[in-house]
Design a protein with these regions (language model features):
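N-terminal export/assembly segments and adjacent metallocofactor-ligating motifs
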Residues: 1-252, 278-281, 423, 613, ...
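Phosphate/diphosphate-binding loops
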Residues: 4, 14-15, 440, 446-450, ...
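Extended redox/cofactor-interaction regions of prokaryotic respiratory oxidoreductases
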Residues: 129-200, 206-208, 212-213, 238, ...
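Long, contiguous, secondary-structure-rich segments that constitute the structural scaffold
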Residues: 506-557, 694-696, 700-711, 715-823
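Active-site phosphate/pyrophosphate-binding segments
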Residues: 243, 268-397
């Protein structure tokens, strides 16, 4: 075996980390230098240190590893940028070309014109964007980024309430909960930490009641929940506000905890004299509109009786967990729903106690995974940073971007982006919003003058490269990773097989570029990948896990992974709960800030209120804002009639408990008719088991199990003459896509669901045949976090009949076809 691996044919290895939300363990069967089979974790299984079992994506990795469409040689563009026409070149020509462009752009414009975009296609310590950032930082720096595509609003909103992102108890503590609200959370598909779904299952077996609130009946709702409550996308804050109304008016909130541990709840504890308190907002003292369940019903399509019942259950089932998913904060005003969930946890006193949950991001106590990256990327000499989602703005108008655009580290950018080095990312095209807009930006070579893409396949983003560098998979090089978000594990990724063709590891590519740029020794420090793995393990042991085995012990004992056992689960804010004066939070007040003075001082109460409020989205079934003041839910007075489902529930005085997906009869009519006549349907995009974002989209094993299709309710389908399995056109003013449909009551009426991550495959007119939802999404961002609001979409759906027999997209016609299927 390579590099002193034990002479056996089964090697424990970390599941290649593509940011699925998990960190799992595989067992690779190796014969004659080839991986022949992948199993999952076979180690002992305990509650304190459970097995890290891989999902179907990890188990299907063998197909990706030996896919016939792997990039084998460096490529150089020969046609129009984006056309997908390339020729093979040598590594020397590729390295020289890239190095020359690096030098040219740096000296012509300055280091801030260089850019490494966000990307998680290779998410361990030694591969992917980490090594590219180390290269750039040693070379003089590049334009920096902050925040993420995944949870930008959560990242910035959570600390405005708690002063930290470490708001989660260790997951073993969920077994102490009596009640769990899975609010827009789908761990069975998107993972959110290996074993999160397993711990929910154990909590339910221990007696916890589990309720899932989601527009779609997800696999998590089906497998883990006692009840599914469909809710109109983008209205979660309205339901949370109405729940607070029930708690306040019925005396169900924890008044003692609120008095001693919170600020901003009522007039006597306001950080700003005379400002509106949370209690006044909920009761409608100033705007004359109490946030009652009836008020929320017409907004959310959730029956008022159901809202009241869930409020009572959550408030009286202490300790209870309200776990927020991330899709609902990737929307217009996504910061509001994050803060609203935190406030519900606070006013019910579910903070700092076993079985409770403070909500927010929920990084795990005690350390929260705050030391994820131990591979030294170094300090960026360029201090300017932009929000990760606004990189296309920096391509178009970087020199005009200021703090008003989220710029940090400088008053104003001094450059537009002129060179992009994209490593293990499909965010240039596929995963970024408003694809057709991005295509137009990147095709204009007077804007971004040079693009390098480094990947395993010719992805949608790769098609816009000037140079493509073929990278190893993570079975073909050394790597190490730790637990995703929950951080209890360190997982080894030993090199198992040799790379095919001329593929090189991300580290080796960057090392050879560094040599040409005159910083070779500084970049490698005399280490190869294996030596850097040893360095990372030593760092983990020094600063975080003193009992972590050495690299030699990992290899000799074929450990694969090491877990810090959770014998006594850590509880976030336990000390603060016990003595808030001795152990204050890091907020300005030292307490839980229901009212944020920081947000108040921004002076934008319509879009960034100091207390969490429901704000109508800019694309909404309720139409355009009736007036500027009407952006706040408190001022909305549109005539919204109750849904038929809500009326039936009200008549019976008990909301229907849907343990299975609802039947068509249970949705006897759509929710309130959309006021958006042109694009009347809301569209959402869930994380499918077919892919990890866009990774695996060309894996036909997974595509067979989870085909790309749009999910539409029978009511919406029948009114459009659409049958199950028909090809349909989904479109709005930004673009159109063609894909098959699945007619099912597992998505609520008025909403369609398109699994995110499918590779963009346009025809010559720009219509996408790959099923990529980002053809439809908007590049608008959230007001406080400057984060993606891609889930705020209105669309229309209609039957589609191709006018061209045997139509194929331009992408599929390319010589280097990223989606070629094999037998």
């Amino acid at each position: 075996m390579l590099n002193k691996l034990p002479e056996i044919n089964k090697i424990r290895v970390g599941c290649p980390a593509h940011n699925c939300g998990g960190r799992c363990l595989l067992v690779a069967h190796i014969k004659d230098g080839r991986i022949t089979r992948l199993d999952t974790d076979d180690r002992p299984d305990t509650l304190a240190a459970p097995q890290l079992r891989a999902c179907v994506r990890g188990r299907a990795y063998l197909r990706r590893q030996y896919h016939p469409d792997r990039l084998m040689t460096p490529l150089k563009r020969v046609g129009r940028r984006g056309g997908g026409e390339f020729r093979s070149i040598s590594w020397d020509e590729a390295f020289d070309s890239v190095a020359v462009q690096f030098e040219r752009v740096k000296h012509q414009y300055g280091s801030s014109a260089l850019f490494v975009p966000y990307g998680t296609g290779s998410y361990n310590q030694l591969n992917g964007s980490h090594v590219a950032r180390r290269l750039m930082n040693l070379y003089g720096g590049c334009l920096g980024i902050y925040n993420s595509y995944s949870w930008a609003a959560t990242n910035l909103a959570t600390p405005t309430v708690y002063g930290t992102l470490i708001t989660g108890n260790q997951r073993q503590d969920w077994l102490n909960a009596k009640y769990i609200l899975m609010w827009g959370w789908n761990p069975a598909e998107m993972r959110d930490g290996t074993n999160s779904d397993y711990f929910i299952k154990l909590a339910r077996q221990a007696g916890a009641r589990v309720v899932c609130i989601d527009p779609r009946h997800s696999l998590s709702a089906a497998a883990l929940a006692d009840e599914w409550i469909p809710i109109r996308p983008g209205t979660d804050t309205a339901m949370m506000s109405a729940m607070a109304f029930v708690m306040l008016t019925e005396g169900l909130y924890d008044a003692d905890f609120v008095r001693t541990h919170c600020v901003g709840f009522e007039a006597g504890q306001m950080p700003v004299e005379g400002a509106e308190s949370y209690k006044d907002y909920i009761l409608g003292v100033r705007d004359g509109l109490p946030k009652t369940p009836q008020w929320a019903e017409s907004i959310t399509a959730v029956p008022a009786v159901t809202i009241a019942r869930i409020a009572r259950e959550y408030a009286t089932s202490k300790p209870a967990v309200l776990y927020q998913g991330y899709g609902m904060q990737r929307r217009a005003y996504g910061e509001q729903v994050v803060r609203a969930g935190c406030v519900l946890a606070a006013i019910t006193g579910n903070v700092g106690l076993p079985g409770g949950w403070a909500s927010g991001l929920g990084l795990q106590a005690p350390d929260g995974g705050g030391l994820w990256n131990v591979f030294p990327t170094g300090e960026n000499p360029v201090k300017a940073e932009i929000p990760v989602f606004l990189w296309t703005e920096a391509c178009l108008r970087g020199r005009d971007m200021t703090a008003a655009d989220g710029v940090r580290g400088t008053q104003q950018l001094d450059n537009d982006i002129k060179l992009i080095y994209a490593v293990a990312t499909n965010c240039l095209i596929n995963q970024h919003a408003d694809i057709n807009r991005t295509v137009a930006i990147l095709r204009d070579e007077t804007k971004v003058e040079f693009i390098v893409v480094q990947d395993n396949f010719l992805t949608s983003s790769g098609r816009f490269a000037d140079i493509i560098l073929p990278a190893c998979t993570q079975f073909e090089t050394w790597g190490v990773e730790d637990g995703w978000k929950y951080g209890d594990e360190v997982i080894l990724q030993p090199k198992l097989v040799e790379p095919p063709g001329e593929c090189k590891s991300d580290y080796r590519i960057c090392a050879e570029l560094a040599e040409r740029l005159g910083i070779g020794n500084a970049f490698t420090e005399g280490r190869d990948e294996r030596a850097w793995v040893k360095y990372c393990l030593d760092e983990f042991r020094r600063i975080r896990f003193p009992e972590l085995p050495t690299l030699e012990e990992f290899i000799d004992q074929n450990l694969g992974a090491w877990t810090r056992p959770a014998i006594l689960p850590a509880i976030a804010f336990a000390d603060f709960r016990r003595d808030p004066e001795k152990f204050p939070l890091t907020t300005p007040s030292g307490k839980i800030e229901i009212f944020s003075k920081q947000l108040f001082e921004l002076g934008n109460p319509v879009e960034i209120p100091a207390i969490p409020k429901y704000i109508q989205e800019w694309e909404s079934p309720f139409g355009e804002f009736p007036c500027e003041e009407g952006r706040e839910g408190a001022a909305l007075t549109l005539n919204r009639e109750p849904t038929t489902l809500a009326l039936a529930a009200r008549a019976s005085e008990q909301a229907p408990v849907l343990q299975k997906s609802p039947t068509l009869e249970e949705f006897v009519s759509p929710p309130t008719a959309s006021r958006n006549k042109t694009y009347p349907l809301q569209a959402i995009g869930h994380h499918t088991l077919q892919r990890v974002h866009s990774t695996h989209d060309n894996n036909d094993w997974l595509e067979e199990a989870f085909p790309q299709q749009v999910f539409i309710n029978p009511i919406d389908a029948s009114g459009r003459g659409i049958q199950d399995g028909d090809e349909v056109k989904v479109f709005n003013e930004r673009g159109a896509l063609i894909l098959p449909c699945r007619v099912t009551p597992r998505i609520m009426p008025g909403v369609v669901d398109i699994p995110q991550g499918a590779w963009y495959e346009p025809d010559k007119d720009g219509t996408d045949y790959g099923g990529n939802i980002n053809v439809l999404t908007s590049h608008k961002w959230t007001p406080f976090a400057f984060g993606t609001a891609q889930h705020t979409i209105m669309v229309q759906v209609e039957p589609f009949t191709s006018k061209v027999k045997g139509h194929t997209s331009i992408a599929r016609q390319s010589t280097f076809d990223p989606r070629r299927r094999s037998s």
